[in-house]
Amino acid sequence: MSHIQIPPGLTELLQGYTVEVGQQPPDLVDFAVEYFTRLREARRQESDTFIVSPTTFHTQESSAVPVIEEDGESDSDSEDADLEVPVPSKFTRRVSVCAETFNPDEEEEDNDPRVVHPKTDEQRCRLQEACKDILLFKNLDQEQLSQVLDAMFEKIVKTDEHVIDQGDDGDNFYVIERGTYDILVTKDNQTRSVGQYDNRGSFGELALMYNTPRAATIIATSEGSLWGLDRVTFRRIIVKNNAKKRKMFESFIESVPLFKSLEMSERMKIVDVIGEKIYKDGERIIAQGEKADSFYIIESGEVSILIRSKTKSNKNGGNQEVEIAHCHKGQYFGELALVTNKPRAASAYGVGDVKCLVMDVQAFERLLGPCMDIMKRNISHYEEQLVKMFGSNLDLMDPGQ
């Protein structure tokens, strides 16, 4: 992609939006409007801060420093708090590792030494418990999550301690294990509380992606414990993983014949509502006769498609299931019932451990309109698929028989 002229700041802008979309908002258009509106307001306020009010902030490493010289990184500091989303800085800051441009698509090779902070078994258990509901960690595989946990360090805080200060450089992402914390924002020399954390949550993630100062101050209102993750590890694993996941999802969607008739913009919308699910060997993924509510693409592993025979019986006297197809990575299943608007015509079982990309039909219809309106563009393909997978004589009218 080196021959394509990418506007300065676009990569960081889209990285931030991509991470935020991981929250699975119900309406992507409304979410985008709200996100970029806050982004614009943050830029205006940042401009006011630098041009109108030459306030100074204190960092952990130095004495008072003029903001215009220390234009560093910003932070939304909360998934839930009502804070402005930061934007890439227009000013020049000192050269540091923290400010280096990060493009996850270009940095395929990673030779940096792994950061490891030794922990006792008890600390590891507490850390895992604190991180189990952190949205940013949801899409990490086991190896990546293990590297993140290895790199995190415990920080014990006291009452009234400033964890981060508005205007400071942002070097760490924090997960709350325990304690309460106030979120304070100063504007026009007026400081106000915009929210509070109560023994759960995380903050500081966007400061690791944008070149603007911290957007808020976080103060402990009780004794507590935090787990920190350094900027380099955060970007190397989490940001890069999100970018790779999205790229992989796009590749899968483009390879599915079912979506050949969709416009590029429509396929990109599909990527935004895809989730992942893992199934164990022999686990049933869909059941014949059940209502169809999801469509599946195999990310890794194999899936066996079976249908109940009308002529063969199992040992319990019921209709025996007979395999009619064996699906592998990149193949998909579960879409035919959505197209025909009928119950599942077959069952699907995992063969070994299986990871599937899952698309909810309601999300699909919300983004692209009723399924049939979209699918009619390529209806001949579905007829071919029906014959290929189930045979021309298969009765789909009553899959429960």
From Swiss-Prot:
The modification Phosphothreonine is found at T212. GO terms for molecular function: cAMP binding; cAMP-dependent protein kinase regulator activity. Phosphorylated by the activated catalytic chain. Residues 61-83 are annotated as: Disordered. Its main location: cytoplasm. The modification Phosphoserine is found at S47, S74, S76, S96, S347, S392. One of its GO terms (cellular component) is glutamatergic synapse. Transmembrane segments: none annotated. 3',5'-cyclic AMP 2 binds at residues 258-401. Residues 68-83 have a biased composition (Acidic residues). 3',5'-cyclic AMP 1 binds at residues 136-257. The modification N-acetylserine is found at S2. It is found in: Cytoplasm; Cell membrane. One of its GO terms (biological process) is modulation of chemical synaptic transmission. SMART domains: cNMP (SM00100), RIIa (SM00394). InterPro entries: cAMP-dep_PK_reg_su-like (IPR050503), cAMP_dep_PK_reg_su (IPR012198), cAMP_dep_PK_reg_su_I/II_a/b (IPR003117), cNMP-bd_CS (IPR018488), cNMP-bd_dom (IPR000595), cNMP-bd_dom_sf (IPR018490), RmlC-like_jellyroll (IPR014710). Residues 2-135 are annotated as: Dimerization and phosphorylation. Gene3D superfamilies: cAMP-dependent protein kinase regulatory subunit, dimerization-anchoring domain, Jelly Rolls. PROSITE patterns: CNMP_BINDING_1 (PS00888), CNMP_BINDING_2 (PS00889), CNMP_BINDING_3 (PS50042). CDD domains: CAP_ED (cd00038), DD_RIIalpha_PKA (cd12103). Keywords: Acetylation, cAMP, cAMP-binding, Cell membrane, Cytoplasm, Membrane, Nucleotide-binding, Phosphoprotein, Repeat. The inactive form of the enzyme is composed of two regulatory chains and two catalytic chains. Activation by cAMP produces two active catalytic monomers and a regulatory dimer that binds four cAMP molecules. Interacts with AKAP4. Interacts with CBFA2T3. Interacts with the phosphorylated form of PJA2. Interacts with MYRIP. This interaction may link PKA to components of the exocytosis machinery, thus facilitating exocytosis, including insulin release. PANTHER family: CAMP-DEPENDENT PROTEIN KINASE REGULATORY CHAIN, CAMP-DEPENDENT PROTEIN KINASE TYPE II-ALPHA REGULATORY SUBUNIT. Regulatory subunit of the cAMP-dependent protein kinases involved in cAMP signaling in cells. Type II regulatory chains mediate membrane association by binding to anchoring proteins, including the MAP2 kinase. This is cAMP-dependent protein kinase type II-alpha regulatory subunit. It comes from Mus musculus (Mouse). The lineage of its organism: Eukaryota, Metazoa, Chordata, Craniata, Vertebrata.
